[in-house]
Amino acid sequence: MIQDKTAIRPAATVIVLRDRASAPKVLMGQRGAQAAFMPNKFVFPGGAVDLQDAAVPLLSEIPNPCKDRLSEESEGPSAQALCAAAIRELFEETGQILGQQAAWPDPVPDGWQAFASKGYRPIAEPLQFVFRAITPPGRPRRFDARFFL
């Protein structure tokens, strides 16, 4: 199946803060010059929601009001899939694990083997949904992104 690159894809992004109260610092990466989406730009860790993110067994529940806010006026991936995607993308792009040591039930969803091999299960409890942004028309790739702290 060929994917329509111009279709708006659901995505999840994590804003990682350190020393929030005294001297805040944020974690960002710079995209490559050849990237189709936002080349050379500094971005937060994140990316598209994959189908298998909906099957990820989160170790903790998504807290309210985060779960309710993620579901408002939204057709598309579940709150669970959005949180799982945020956690997966954070791990893939930075190596940071948002999880607790625990065994995974079999089978581990595709795309999650590296995370599971570390002996951790993803936890959504620390995630705080901040805002939603849709890439404007005219870009080569468009995303309907949810941003988490």
Model-derived segments and their meaning:
Residues 1-149:
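N-terminal leader/linker segments that precede catalytic domains of diphosphate-processing enzymes
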